Amino acid sequence: MLDAFSRSVVSADAKTAPVGGSDLAGLRSYVRDGNKRLDAVNAITSNASCIVSDAVTGMICENTGLIQAGGNCYPNRRMAACLRDGEIVLRYISYALLAGDASVLDDRCLNGLKETYIALGVPTQSAGRAVAIMKASATAHIGETNTPGLGGKRFRKMETTQGDCAALVAEAGAYFDRVIGAIS
């Protein structure tokens, strides 16, 4: 796993040159937006259980056969495994967002995930749909476009650094799309 700093050093070392120019400008931008990045990761991790449970619920509402006898979310242990997998995927996406690099997501989460799901008989289309729902929820939390809806007292609006988070929303969205692409 390489963070933005390590990537710049490795790149400069490969060119046998000091870190400078566009690499240095990229690092300045990374540091300047660091608090926004931390707030984005905090928004995901603070709401992780809600994001995952809502995604699994949405997936099941769209395919009720998953909770019937023989379905992949029946009995309880399979449902628990589904929730656990969603939390693991979300955790690695938050790691990638914090580092500003997808290598940790690719190496430790996505490598062999589709093959594992196929071997276990997990419907990859449903898993991909759950990740798409997680993407919608997580990016709403990052971009602060989440609304109380039916959440009532459970709704939390995070205190975050002011400024445009569109780039972080897009980056997080790209990580979710990477997961969807890997399991579809």
UniProtKB/Swiss-Prot annotation:
PANTHER family: C-PHYCOCYANIN BETA SUBUNIT, PHYCOBILISOME 32.1 KDA LINKER POLYPEPTIDE, PHYCOCYANIN-ASSOCIATED, ROD 2-RELATED. Light-harvesting photosynthetic bile pigment-protein from the phycobiliprotein complex. Keywords: Antenna complex, Bile pigment, Chromophore, Electron transport, Membrane, Methylation, Photosynthesis, Phycobilisome, Thylakoid, Transport. Coiled coil: none annotated. Heterodimer of an alpha and a beta chain. One of its GO terms (biological process) is photosynthesis. Transmembrane segments: none annotated. It comes from the Bacteria. Gene3D superfamilies: Phycocyanins. (2R,3E)-phycoerythrobilin 3 binds at C165. One of its GO terms (cellular component) is phycobilisome. The gene is cpeB. InterPro entries: Globin-like_sf, Phycobilisome_asu/bsu, Phycobilisome_asu/bsu_sf. It is found in: Cellular thylakoid membrane. (2R,3E)-phycoerythrobilin 2 binds at C82. Belongs to the phycobiliprotein family. This is C-phycoerythrin class 1 subunit beta. It comes from Synechococcus sp. (strain WH8020).
